[in-house]
Amino acid sequence: MAGVSIWEDEKMSEHARWQGRYAVPDYIFGEEPNAFLAAQKHLLPTGGKALAVADGEARNGVWLAQQGLDVTSIDFSSNAQDKARALAKSRGVNITLECVDVHAWPYPENTFDVVVEIFTQFSTPEERTLKWDGMIRCLKPGGLLLLEGYTPKQLEYKTGGPKEIERLYTRSMLEKGFAKLARFEIKEYDTHMSEGAGHAGMAAVIDLIGYK
């Protein structure tokens, strides 16, 4: 396309790819929350504001709303957010949906009690830094940050996630990326996933639970 940089063309292609994936009737990652997220229910505050980053069809954002949180769900796919809207309605909850580039969103300072990022590994290393810095910035002091992603070992399983190793998460990457948090813990393990067609089978994952 004349006048469009290679980087911009790649971004548009990524957007088109996800728009296409989300155009199917089924929820590609299922309608239930991510297992790691659901297992942290006991850590959630009673009330407050939550941000779900690159939330797609909002299975996680809707679940957070069901726990009594005021949820903002951001994603760049309008097709995904159409399905998110329908899922929220079917569960009897309201969430705020913003169709945006998660790397360019302002992440307002000290706004959210909970910030969640689950399997959003489409960012370049530079974009990832912007996104993670924003996630930390918008978290209130004492707020909870929950993250799950695939590790490089996931390339052996071939059951989902990116094929580019630089987009997969390592312990040292998370330790550096979230060093500004007051405290955090990281766990790596293999698990069997059953979260829609998009996350099915054995997987190599890494989790972070942190507080600002």
Residue ranges of model-derived segments:
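Conserved SAM-binding strand-loop segment of SAM-dependent methyltransferases
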Residues: 91-103
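Short alpha-helix
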Residues: 166-186
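Conserved beta-strand signature within the Rossmann-like core of class I S-adenosyl-L-methionine
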Residues: 142-150
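A short acidic, Gly/Pro-enriched loop at the edge of an enzyme's catalytic core
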Residues: 103-114
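Conserved class I S-adenosyl-L-methionine
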Residues: 3-45, 47-56, 153
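A short, conserved alpha-helix within the catalytic core of class I
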Residues: 122-135
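Conserved SAM/SAH-binding beta-strand->alpha-helix loop
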Residues: 77-79
